Amino acid sequence: MAGLASGATTACRATPMSAATTGLPLRVRGIAKRYGDSDVLRGIDLEIAPSACVAIVGRSGCGKSTLLRVIAGLETADVGTVDSGRAPLAAQRDAVRLMFQDARLLPWKRVIDNVALGLGRAGRAQAQQALDAVGLGTRGNAWPSALSGGQRQRVALARALVHRPRLLLLDEPLGALDALTRIEMQQLIVQLWRQHGFTLVLVTHDVAEASALADRIVVLEHGKVGLDVAVPVPHPRAPGLPALASIQAQVLSRLLGTTQVPEPAAPKAQTRHGPPRGATAQDTSPLQRIL
């Protein structure tokens, strides 16, 4: 499925950014992938409804990015199929876009020309609409080197959105950003997903991020689905909601291989300031250390 990455240069006709769309259904059946002696994916089955937002989380090396690349067609599964409706997803490649942690902007092209790649004569007008949608409408003539990390990721998101995707795949796109910029980007992604209606599949190592964005979290472990849990919390989601904390604890419990995530102990009365004897100011609860 060439041309799925957000930096693809394959020519296509863009539709107006204001047009609504319907997300693609996604069905993954029996996907297995092996590298040498290592079974990275071992019989993955997933079914994702149109316009759903699903987060895939797991420990490093569990196969989550490999699964996303198989869905995108950048890797070929040894066994199994990836379909959309009654047809292979490969037949819908123009409706699929993939965004990486690295924005992959062309440094010799201005921002607006990076977004307009492959769009033909109407590309600049469509690119301007996409930049407006991600809050960078005035930065079209800037060079990528003049942008912050968060701004470069906004450009990469605009470059994907300008093609009006029906399936948007995000491979840890916010992993290199600072905490506040991550929150801003999370809010932007949710806003655009709700506005445009595409199906969204996000790979992340951040459980809090998964629960902030997704309406379903899938945990991969040892190349298989270990947990599949709904997040029935309406958007917008404020950090610290008890319902989100409960879901995060459930997911973390699975990732840590425990039956229960320890709750922070209630502090005892202190007669002096500072941490208890034997502790340091950096000591935190197990849950906080993971997050």
Swiss-Prot record:
Please report the stretch or stretches of sequence annotated as the ABC transporter domain. Answer: 26-247
One Gene Ontology term of the molecular function aspect = ATP hydrolysis activity
Q: Is Phosphoprotein among this UniProt entry's keywords?
A: no
Under the heading Pfam families, the entry gives:
ABC_tran (PF00005)
Q: Does the entry feature the keyword Transport, yes or no?
A: yes
Tell me, in one coarse class, where this protein mainly resides: membrane
Which keywords annotate this record?
ATP-binding, Cell inner membrane, Cell membrane, Membrane, Nucleotide-binding, Translocase, Transport
Q: How does it sit in the membrane?
A: Peripheral membrane protein
Write down the InterPro entries for this protein, in alphabetical order. AAA+_ATPase (IPR003593), ABC_transporter-like_ATP-bd (IPR003439), ABC_transporter-like_CS (IPR017871), ABC_transporter_ATP-bind (IPR050166), P-loop_NTPase (IPR027417)
Q: Which CDD domains does the UniProt record give?
A: ABC_NrtD_SsuB_transporters
The domain of life for this entry's organism is Bacteria
Which reaction is the catalytic activity of this chain? ATP + H2O + aliphatic sulfonate-[sulfonate-binding protein]Side 1 = ADP + phosphate + aliphatic sulfonateSide 2 + [sulfonate-binding protein]Side 1
Q: Where in the cell is it found?
A: Cell inner membrane
For bias kind Polar residues, which ranges apply? 281-291
Q: Which residues form a coiled coil?
A: none
- Please give the name of this protein: Aliphatic sulfonates import ATP-binding protein SsuB 2
